[in-house]
Amino acid sequence: MVILLAGAGGQLGRDLQPALAGTDLHPFDHRQLDITDAGAVEAAVERVRPDWVINAAAFNDVDGAEQAEDQAFAVNAAGAGNLAEAAARVGAAILHISTDYVFDGTKGSPYTEDDEPNPLSVYARSKYEGEQRVLGSGASACVLRTAWLYGWQGKNFVKAILAAAERGGPIRVVADQVGSPTATRDLAEAIAGLIQTPHPQSPLFHVVNAGACSRFEFARAIVGGRVAVEPITTEQSGRLARRPAYSALSSSRWPATGLPALSGWETALVRFLSEKQAAQH
């Protein structure tokens, strides 16, 4: 199986590479392939002739997007469309990564694939438009929505909390945002499994570590009582972009793939932190 991976230098892209080790993988980071350049994308896809294009590239600075709307839409919407259209031209399938932030957070229970998106921020609107461009491209397309990603590569909430704990508490964390923390390694393994299935039974899946928690609860689990964590409100955090208050995801469609469900978020976090501990000894 031949795979073109866009966004190979990001935190998910870097964990996808070992997960896809058994394939003929062609990874491109943003320096090697600017997905906003339609001509460059077409040339890369024509050269590789992949069975699958995986788009893990994104402009994911949620607050920064409020002041860089053109750039956010260029990457998250137009760039995704460029990859999907190029995939369609060579008969490749495309798997595109999206976000829980396409929802407005008013449901109050986990969102499934059948719930209607209502994005609140520039970032969220750009990601939702990217979904629509991919699904409307004519390619055999699959959108995976995930949430609150963390891994050892790149910047993420877990690494930020660990760094804050090293400096000493208290750490102030929002308690009125609830979501589904997801380890990039678990998501990468799920993606590797999905593209090996004969035909994904749905064009849209929610793929997250099971369960939900607030940012405050997540931070407390990360530090394990080593430093104090204090709850604050989203308003007190002073963030530019609006965020959904409750964006936990669940999947009504993943079981039909026959692939295992991802572990609970607590289990994934314990495994992640134990790997850090082992690396230090």
Question: How would you name each of these model-derived features?
Answer:
Residues 214-220, 232-281:
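Conserved C-terminal active-site "lid" loop/helix of NAD(P)H-dependent oxidoreductases
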